[in-house]
């Protein structure tokens, strides 16, 4: 919904799920990453899941989701800046609409799920939804040494939604 439909409970749920969860996980992992870097010189990689519906692009009726995913982008860049000289890289992936069980739940909540799915697909320039298998190689790249010089970046995998 819009800001007018977003209750404080909706706001808290979305921010807890999308931003706070990443904060908690990163805060727990960073001390061990720092220890390992100090002992071995090896670098660690944090990969966050943002969305193109964040600071990259706004979509109607996605107010709190977009705001919470924009927080993920900010968190990613802040962590990258804080730890770039301490052996930790931090990047985010910003997918477009991915065909997941979560999306299926949202679609099935519409009065006409067939029409809802058609609407989700229609906003994709490629004419289809992404699959998790299309996002996974970006995760592998960011976790690997192939991306050793990348930090603080947001990688869009959106089927052309942002062009």
Q: Which residue ranges define each predicted feature?
A:
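Active-site helix of classical SDR
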Residues: 26, 68, 76
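Short, small/polar-rich loop/turn modules that mediate ligand/substrate recognition or access, typified
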Residues: 84, 89, 150-152
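Residue(s) in the substrate-gating loop at a strand-loop-helix junction
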Residues: 51
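Short, flexible catalytic-loop segment of classical short-chain dehydrogenase/reductase
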Residues: 95-106
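Alpha-helical segment proximal to the catalytic Tyr-Lys
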Residues: 31, 81-82, 148
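Substrate-binding pocket helix/loop in short-chain dehydrogenase/reductase
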Residues: 2-3, 7-12, 120
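C-terminal helical subdomain
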Residues: 92, 114-146, 150, 159
């Amino acid at each position: 919904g819009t800001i007018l439909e977003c209750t404080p409970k909706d706001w808290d749920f979305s921010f807890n799920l999308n931003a706070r969860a990443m904060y908690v996980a990163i805060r727990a992992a960073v001390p061990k990453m720092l220890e390992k870097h100090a002992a071995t010189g090896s670098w660690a990689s944090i990969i966050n899941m943002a969305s193109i519906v964040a600071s990259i692009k706004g979509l109607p009726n996605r107010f709190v989701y977009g705001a919470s995913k924009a927080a993920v982008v900010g968190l990613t860049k802040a962590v990258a800046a804080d730890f770039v000289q301490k052996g930790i890289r931090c990047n985010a992936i910003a997918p477009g609409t991915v065909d997941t069980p979560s999306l299926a739940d949202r679609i099935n909540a519409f009065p006409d799920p067939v029409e809802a799915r058609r609407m989700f697909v229609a906003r994709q320039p490629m004419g289809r939804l992404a699959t998790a298998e299309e996002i996974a190689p970006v995760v592998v790249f960011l976790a690997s040494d192939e991306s050793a010089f990348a930090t603080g970046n947001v990688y869009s995998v959106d089927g052309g939604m942002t062009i």
